Amino acid sequence: MGRAFEYRRASKEARWDKMSKLFPKLAKAIQVAAKEGGADPDMNPKLRSAIATAKANNMPKDNIDAAIKRASGKDSADIKNIHYEGKAAHGALIIVECMSDNPTRTVANVKAIFSKNGGEILQNGSLTFMFSHKAVFHLEKYNGDLEELELDLIDAGLEELDQDDEELRIIGDYTAFGELSNAIEKKALVLKKAGLEYLANNPVSFSEEQLLDIEKLLDKLEDDDDVQAVYTNIE
């Protein structure tokens, strides 16, 4: 997904009151990370990043602690990571990441959203080769020497570092998530959010009118309780 389009989406979300949707999704990410890698953030980079992302979005500590506790509970839901691939209006490519305790419900909802908003679901594997799976860290702007920071992070798996007026973004291969997370923490950089993302290999430009059509589908997907993230090939 292109940087300009990311900020367009971010500013749009900032105008909407989405906390009622956001906090449960952040809690679900924390719960899954804790269940997969253990409840100790010091030993679990994914959990550590999920917690940092939640804090950056002003999620209360009680909510964070409750999500971690649910992961180790006897009655904790079996939440699965699922992804779907599809096309929006004007041929925009979309990968949808979900966390769900009921995949049957989730796939039905996602299919309905695509079909009702000018899109279509594709067979999994149809689009993933057009994207790269990356560890992506979104951070507050860095005021130090970027070249020096880049050199310091290369050994941890850094592939790309870029900064604009909004944030610093650090990218590495998905297998380097843990190492990069540890290296970033040692640098005392301020994390806004982090995770594994699908980045388009060849982003495509769309007109303003086309983007409005595409965003109708994106908005509906992002509003679904089971959808954690939506990635596109929009430049």
UniProtKB/Swiss-Prot annotation:
It holds the Pfam family Transcrip_reg. It is found in: Cytoplasm. Keywords: Cytoplasm, DNA-binding, Transcription, Transcription regulation. Disulfide bonds: none annotated. It comes from the Bacteria. Transmembrane segments: none annotated. GO terms for biological process: regulation of DNA-templated transcription. Belongs to the TACO1 family. This is Probable transcriptional regulatory protein Cla_1081.
